[in-house]
Amino acid sequence: MYKIAFDVMGSDNGSAVAIEAASRFIKSRKDLYLVFVGDEDQIKTSLEKFPIDESRFEILATKEFIDMNGSIMDIRRKKDSSMVRALETLKDKKVDAMITGGNSAAFIAGSHFILGELNGISRPGFMPTLPTAVSNKLTLLLDVGANLEADIEDIIGYAKMANIYAKNVLKIENPLIAQLNIGEEKSKGTLLQKEIYKELESDENINFFGNLESRDILAGKVDIIVTDGYTGNMCLKAFEGASKILMTEIKSQLYKTIFTKLKALTLKKSFDNVSKKFDYKNHSGAILLGVEGIAFKAHGSSDVKSFEATLRMTCDAVENDVLNKIKKELN
């Protein structure tokens, strides 16, 4: 039985959405036990509407939560916040993993102060899973914003940790790893990127593809893409925004006139398949790689679908024991 602490406070859409997602998801996982962390009254009210078998959950009541406008200092100030308590349950090994949809900066700071980093890692990285144009193929991208800067050791660490994750969770035998850059040529990029290229190329344990341009992130050419958090975050948000706008525009054009509506009926299945594949909500959530625990960050604006995706990814990480395997690799 896997035990996951779920901080249901602090996200944009409130605790009810998180509870609804949990209620739907837990039906498909008989091996899952949830610890809901947050305002007890709100949680109980939501559970009345979205019931869960009482043997499958417990409530860890807190009096505070860190909202999106909070600061990293709230980790120190709000000792009884849902995020802090969820992180503490993970540190104390009372749960196997934790999830929050709350303030990203506070989550990163809390993970640093409460969980601490793994041996050899100074800057953890957020790693989401992205869809690609290749059927049934996903790509891992990191860092997407845990840290704005990264040095050579950070990027090499990201590559090593993501390599273990891809092998065990995505079941890829020999993951292909690329560095995000402004061109494919070895000579492209900053001095730092050129040095990173040399390090990745010379590492016998890394199956290095070379440089990858941002236009090919979703092409399915590689399994893992490493970059600094500033660049990665911009790429991720560009994908999310473009995906949303493109799907909305296609739908608008298909339902513009009676003629196009009739035509749309013949294309509905194909459109639904593409829409489902590239809807970022189906891949929402990012693991914070490099900390002493399996900690996932759901999107701040998560809806039910997004939270379900994060729950699924968290269960996969726990089930495949990625933390211990990453620690073994780093040591």
From Swiss-Prot:
Its EC number is 2.3.1.274. One of its GO terms (biological process) is phospholipid biosynthetic process. This is Phosphate acyltransferase. Pathway: Lipid metabolism; phospholipid metabolism. Its main location: cytoplasm. GO terms for cellular component: cytoplasm. Disulfide bonds: none annotated. GO terms for molecular function: phosphate:acyl-[acyl carrier protein] acyltransferase activity. It catalyses: a fatty acyl-[ACP] + phosphate = an acyl phosphate + holo-[ACP]. Coiled coil: none annotated. Catalyzes the reversible formation of acyl-phosphate (acyl-PO(4)) from acyl-[acyl-carrier-protein] (acyl-ACP). This enzyme utilizes acyl-ACP as fatty acyl donor, but not acyl-CoA. Homodimer. Probably interacts with PlsY. InterPro entries: FA_synthesis, Phospholipid_synth_PlsX-like. It comes from the Bacteria. Keywords: Cytoplasm, Lipid biosynthesis, Lipid metabolism, Phospholipid biosynthesis, Phospholipid metabolism, Transferase. Belongs to the PlsX family. It is found in: Cytoplasm. NCBIfam families: plsX. PANTHER family: FATTY ACID/PHOSPHOLIPID SYNTHESIS PROTEIN PLSX (PTHR30100), PHOSPHATE ACYLTRANSFERASE (PTHR30100:SF1).
